[in-house]
Design a protein with these regions (language model features):
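N-terminal hydrophobic/helix-forming segments and targeting peptides
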Residues: 1-117
Length: 117
């Protein structure tokens, strides 16, 4: 029913780490997946990826555009006694949907799983 390659791509993409300013991981996943569907792939210094699929006719042309980053947060404080973190959003976020959200905190020593409470 569904293309297994497409399902695996979406799984890898949604599980990748890509908040604003750190889009390299999801960009690499998209680039790898799309190269088999494109005649040309260009990635600029800012991380934008352009895929070109050449058609047979001059018109019409279609542009599909989107962003590759996800909403993230920056840790702004750590309570040494409880281990609770305070944080500020990077990008837009709806405060009312934060409770019970699973998060990944990327540190110099590796990723840490957490839940917003």
């Amino acid at each position: 029913m569904f293309d297994k390659k497409a399902i695996e791509f979406l799984k890898n993409l949604t599980e990748s780490f890509g908040p604003s300013g750190f889009e390299r991981e999801p960009a690499g996943i998209v680039k790898e997946y799309m190269k088999s569907y494109s005649d040309d792939v260009v990635m600029d210094k800012l991380g934008s990826i352009v895929f070109v699929a050449k058609g047979q006719a001059e018109k019409p042309r279609v542009l599909l555009a989107g962003h590759i980053d996800e909403v993230g947060f920056v840790v702004s404080g750590i309570d040494e006694n409880s281990g609770f973190l305070t944080f500020n959003p990077v990008g837009g976020w709806w405060d009312q949907v934060l409770l019970s959200q699973k998060v990944v905190i990327r540190t110099a020593k590796g990723d840490v799983q957490g839940v917003i409470a």
